[in-house]
C-alpha cells in the first residue's frame, strides 16, 4: 500500500525516490487522495533536498501521464512534431513568427501556450488581440489545423497534465515556486503531453527574466535539456538576453502588429530577428529538417522572403476563427489605445541599463496584464518605440511611447519608464544570444 507520508519522509531525509513511488504520488495528486498539505510538504522537501536527474524525469513523466497525451502518429504527418518554449519575458513575440516559419520549412508545430504571468506577457493574451481567434478550440479543430496548416497556437486544456496545475497552485502559495527541479517538471510535462518529437527551450537571462540570476537561468537550461532528453524528447536550449524588451514594443495588439510587420517584411528589428532565427534554426536542426544551423537559416530566410511563413500565419488565423485579411489590413482589426503619449528623456545620454521587469509591470498596470487570474485585459494598451541599450537619446526625445486607456494610467506608466531607464555617457548593448545547451 502506498503511503504518501512515507514517500515524503524519504525526500525529507534525503533518500532517493523511485519511479513507481513518484507515479503513485502524482496519481494521488490527480485523484485527490494526496492532500494539499502533503503536496506542500513534498514541494518543500524537494526545495531543500532537490531531485536527481532520474527523479526529475520520473516526476515529469508522472505529471505528463496524469492526463491526456496527444498522439500525432495517426495523422501520418510527413515531418517532425516540434516546438519552442520560452521562460517568458517582455516583448517576447517570437512564437508568433517561429511557428509559421518552421511550418513553412516542413515542421509541424502544435504550440500549447499560456497567459501572462507576473511581469511577463503571454502568447495567448497576444492572440486574444485578434478578433475571432479561438485560443481554446476543440481537439479535433486543433489537430486539423496542425495537419493542414502546419502550426496551431492554442491554450492548455484542463486535460493536459492536470497534476501539474494542482501542484503549481500549491507551490505558488508555499514559497516553493523557485525549485529548478519542479519548474523543469512543470514545463516539460506539458510539452511531453503535447506529443512532441523535439523541443528547443528559450531560457531568458537578465532584468526581465523569470530566473533571478544568470547562474540560475543556466541551471534551469541544463536541467530542462537533461530531463527532456531523459524522457525521450530531443531537447536543446539557448540562453537569450532579457535585459530589455525583446521587441521594440510590449503589449498585446502592439506585439501582434510587430509580428505581422516581421512576417511581411515591413520591419524586422535586429534583436528580435536574431533570437527568432536562432531558435527557429535550432528547431529545424533538432527536427532533422536541416543539416546544420547555416542550412536552417537559409531555409528560414527563404520562407520569409517568399511570403510562405506569412501565408502560414494567415492560414492559422483563419483556421482558428480570425479575419482573412488580418495581414493585409491589421489596423482594421487590432485595437488601438485611446491615449498615446511620448515619454521624453529627462536628459541627454546613452541608455546604459533598463529595468526590464519594471517595463513589464508598467504594461500590467496599464491593463495589458493580470494581477489576478480572473482579471480581464485590455489588448490595446502597452509601450512602443522603446529605446535600446547603447542607443543615444537627446533630452526631450522619447524613450518610448505609452498606449493607454486614459491620461492617468498613461502618466503612471510614463513615470515607470523614466525610472526604468538609466542614461550615462557611454553604454554598450548586451549580447542577444549567450549560450547553447545540449
Swiss-Prot record:
SMART domains: PYNP_C. GO terms for molecular function: 1,4-alpha-oligoglucan phosphorylase activity; thymidine phosphorylase activity. Its EC number is 2.4.2.4. GO terms for cellular component: cytosol. Pathway: Pyrimidine metabolism; dTMP biosynthesis via salvage pathway; dTMP from thymine: step 1/2. The keyword rRNA-binding does not apply. It catalyses: thymidine + phosphate = 2-deoxy-alpha-D-ribose 1-phosphate + thymine. It comes from the Bacteria. The keyword Glycosyltransferase applies. Homodimer. Belongs to the thymidine/pyrimidine-nucleoside phosphorylase family. The enzymes which catalyze the reversible phosphorolysis of pyrimidine nucleosides are involved in the degradation of these compounds and in their utilization as carbon and energy sources, or in the rescue of pyrimidine bases for nucleotide synthesis. This is Thymidine phosphorylase. The lineage of its organism: Bacteria, Pseudomonadati, Pseudomonadota, Betaproteobacteria, Burkholderiales.
Amino acid at each position: 500500500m502506498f503511503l504518501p507520508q512515507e514517500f515524503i519522509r524519504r525526500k525529507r531525509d534525503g533518500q532517493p525516490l523511485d519511479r513507481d513511488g513518484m507515479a503513485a504520488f502524482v496519481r494521488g495528486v490527480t485523484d485527490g487522495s494526496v492532500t494539499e498539505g502533503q503536496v506542500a510538504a513534498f514541494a518543500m522537501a524537494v526545495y531543500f533536498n532537490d531531485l536527481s536527474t532520474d527523479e526529475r524525469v520520473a516526476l515529469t513523466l508522472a505529471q505528463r501521464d496524469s492526463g491526456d497525451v496527444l498522439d500525432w502518429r495517426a495523422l501520418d504527418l510527413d515531418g517532425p512534431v516540434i516546438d519552442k518554449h520560452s521562460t517568458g519575458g517582455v516583448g517576447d513575440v517570437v512564437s508568433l513568427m517561429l511557428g509559421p516559419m518552421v511550418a513553412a520549412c516542413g515542421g509541424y508545430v502544435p504550440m500549447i501556450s499560456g497567459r501572462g504571468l507576473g511581469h511577463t506577457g503571454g502568447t495567448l493574451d497576444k492572440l486574444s488581440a485578434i478578433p475571432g481567434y479561438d485560443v481554446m478550440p476543440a481537439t479535433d479543430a486543433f489537430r486539423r489545423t496542425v495537419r493542414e496548416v502546419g502550426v496551431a497556437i492554442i491554450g492548455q486544456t484542463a486535460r493536459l497534465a492536470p497534476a501539474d496545475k494542482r501542484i503549481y497552485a500549491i507551490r505558488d502559495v508555499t514559497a516553493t515556486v523557485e525549485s529548478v527541479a519542479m519548474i523543469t517538471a512543470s514545463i516539460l510535462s506539458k510539452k511531453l503531453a503535447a506529443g512532441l518529437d523535439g523541443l528547443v527551450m528559450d531560457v531568458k537571462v537578465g532584468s526581465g527574466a523569470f530566473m533571478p540570476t544568470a547562474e540560475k537561468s543556466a541551471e534551469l537550461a541544463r536541467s530542462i535539456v537533461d530531463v527532456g532528453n531523459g524522457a525521450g524528447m530531443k531537447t536543446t536550449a539557448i540562453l537569450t538576453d532579457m535585459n530589455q524588451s525583446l521587441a521594440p514594443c510590449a503589449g498585446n495588439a502592439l506585439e501582434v502588429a510587430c509580428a505581422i510587420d516581421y512576417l511581411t517584411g515591413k520591419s524586422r528589428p535586429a534583436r528580435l530577428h536574431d533570437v527568432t532565427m536562432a531558435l527557429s534554426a535550432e528547431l529545424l536542426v533538432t527536427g532533422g529538417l536541416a543539416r546544420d544551423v547555416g542550412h536552417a537559416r537559409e531555409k528560414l530566410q527563404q520562407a520569409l522572403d517568399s511570403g510562405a511563413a506569412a501565408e502560414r500565419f494567415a492560414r492559422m488565423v483563419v483556421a482558428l476563427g480570425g479575419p482573412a485579411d488580418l495581414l493585409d489590413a491589421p489596423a482594421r482589426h487590432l485595437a488601438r489605445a485611446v491615449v498615446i503619449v511620448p515619454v521624453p528623456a529627462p536628459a541627454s545620454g546613452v541608455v546604459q541599463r533598463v529595468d526590464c521587469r519594471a517595463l513589464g509591470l508598467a504594461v500590467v498596470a496599464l491593463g495589458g496584464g493580470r494581477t489576478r487570474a480572473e482579471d480581464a485585459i485590455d489588448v490595446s494598451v502597452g509601450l512602443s518605440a522603446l529605446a535600446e541599450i547603447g542607443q543615444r537619446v537627446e533630452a526631450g526625445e522619447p524613450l518610448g511611447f505609452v498606449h493607454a486607456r486614459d491620461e492617468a494610467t498613461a502618466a503612471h506608466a510614463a513615470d515607470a519608464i523614466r525610472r526604468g531607464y538609466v542614461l550615462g555617457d557611454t553604454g554598450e548593448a548586451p549580447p542577444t544570444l549567450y549560450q547553447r545547451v545540449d
